[in-house]
């Protein structure tokens, strides 16, 4: 490992932030990237860069939809969500957050320079404010509202 490689130093720094903030998701993700970077698997980075976000969103969607698919969240519960004002508000907020996430994906794809800032901000939010590490896509969506998507 070449410790004078700035990319490795950045990844190690982000991994350290993940460890310090007890953000296992960030820590594991960075460590996987380090393993890829330091092994012959490095040749797969173009594929990871092109498909990684899409695969991650697919896995996230599977996790969100699993309670419906397994029957834990019944069809009647889903249908009743259209009858209560809190559930209707949750639907509206879910639509808004999904829209923001979509803007975030576009921004992160078109302006990769913001990804590190979003990641550091998310890790700091977890470490300093007891936040939850679910924010980079939504944060990117909010950022896109402020700075534009190009």
Swiss-Prot record:
Source superkingdom: Bacteria
Protein keywords: Cell membrane, Membrane, Transmembrane, Transmembrane helix
Pfam family, one: DUF441
Tagged with keyword Transmembrane helix: yes
Record-annotated membrane-spanning stretches: 16-36, 53-73, 82-102, 114-134
Membrane topology, as annotated: Multi-pass membrane protein
Gene Ontology, cellular component aspect: plasma membrane
Entries under InterPro entries matching the protein: UPF0756_TM (IPR007382)
Subcellular location, record wording: Cell membrane
Family statement drawn from the similarity comment of this UniProt entry: Belongs to the UPF0756 family.
Protein's recorded name: UPF0756 membrane protein SG1722
Species this chain originates from: Sodalis glossinidius (strain morsitans)
Upper lineage: Bacteria, Pseudomonadati, Pseudomonadota, Gammaproteobacteria, Enterobacterales
